[in-house]
UniProtKB/Swiss-Prot annotation:
InterPro entries: Ribosomal_bL35, Ribosomal_bL35-like, Ribosomal_bL35_CS, Ribosomal_bL35_sf
Keyword flag Ribonucleoprotein: yes
Recorded superkingdom: Bacteria
Native organism taxonomy: Bacteria, Pseudomonadati, Pseudomonadota, Betaproteobacteria, Burkholderiales
Family statement: Belongs to the bacterial ribosomal protein bL35 family.
Transmembrane segments: none
Protein name as annotated: Large ribosomal subunit protein bL35
GO cellular component: cytosolic large ribosomal subunit
Amino acid sequence: MPKMKTKKSAAKRFQVRGSGSIKRGQAFKRHILTKKTTKNKRQLRGSAAVHETNIASVKAMMPFA
């Protein structure tokens, strides 16, 4: 059986919290920011939690997290 490996792209994007929930960054805030309102950009700050329907697939990509 081959080695289990972590998907490095997922490891760079997600962090597992102590409670088991997974933290992710917000999308839509890297570029083309001039046409976005100040309110919209402010609301995109910080991080968010991965939805419960996606937690299993994210954990499968990071078997050691």
